[in-house]
């Protein structure tokens, strides 16, 4: 299961602790009936200044919280895509990767696919074209 999430929660005022707790609860629910299920948490992506202006620091802190959570939780992997969308932590996203300043466009999704593929298909010769 891949989670690509977090930005709407930040926009609605949830704290990083609340957000991580919500995802922990979802994971625990699934693991109760399927303990071998694997999870990937994709980092919360940055936005352009058009969306959630001033929230870049919160996005960075949420990603650190997700990473810590994944490091201590069995069968959960944190994958960084933030770096591909942003020059450095705390700055706004490259606008050419987002359709509206918030959601990835085709080029942005291709970038995500390239980043996720090794985690989803580690034993194959699958190539993205």
Language model regions located:
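Catalytic His-Asp segment of secreted/periplasmic serine-dependent ester chemistry enzymes
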Residues: 45-129
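Short, flexible active-site loop motifs that bind/organize anionic cofactors or intermediates
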Residues: 9, 29, 99
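Glycine/proline-rich loop-helix segments at beta-alpha junctions forming the active-site rim
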Residues: 31, 40, 56-57
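Sec-exported extracytoplasmic/periplasmic mature domains
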Residues: 6, 15, 24, 28-35, ...
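Oxyanion-hole/transition-state-stabilizing segment in secreted/luminal serine hydrolases
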Residues: 1-20, 44-50
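Structural recognition of the beta-strand scaffold that forms the well-ordered cores
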Residues: 1-5, 9, 38-43, 77-80, ...
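Charged helix-capping and loop-helix junction motifs
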Residues: 16-26, 56-63
